[in-house]
From Swiss-Prot:
It comes from the Bacteria. This is UPF0102 protein HPG27_782. It holds the Pfam family UPF0102. GO terms for molecular function: nucleic acid binding.
Length: 114
């Protein structure tokens, strides 16, 4: 597990908070934030039109944050989603999304797996 300094963590939490506000404007209902399992964390779990969206928030100023979502990160997210469904309703439709925050702008990339 990686440990970050308080400044880095605070920046990430701020980006997640702003992301939730943005998602609400798109009609998403926040279900849960920062769901942890032994495999990793899901930043935001939101519901829209009966579909659960497991959303990874990435922010950055000097690089394209999408590159921080690696195949390894996606595998950890999938394992964490399985843990979530073992505790919650396993019959929900779902997708994995990325929300990119860069220079105060948001870009939602839905269903980033294939």
């Amino acid at each position: 597990m990686r440990f970050f300094n308080n400044k880095h963590r605070a920046k990430g939490l701020k980006a997640e908070e702003e992301a939730c506000g943005f998602l609400k404007t798109l009609g998403f209902e926040m279900v849960e934030r920062n769901f942890f399992s032994q495999f990793g964390e899901i930043d935001i779990i939101a519901l829209k039109k009966g579909v659960l969206h497991f959303i990874e928030v990435k922010s950055g100023e000097n690089f394209d944050p999408i590159y921080a979502i690696t195949p390894s990160k996606l595998k950890k997210m999938i394992k964490t989603i399985r843990c979530y469904f073992s505790q919650k309703d396993p019959n929900s439709d779902f997708c994995i999304d990325a929300l990119i925050v860069k220079n105060g702008k948001f870009e939602l990339l839905e269903n980033i797996t294939f």
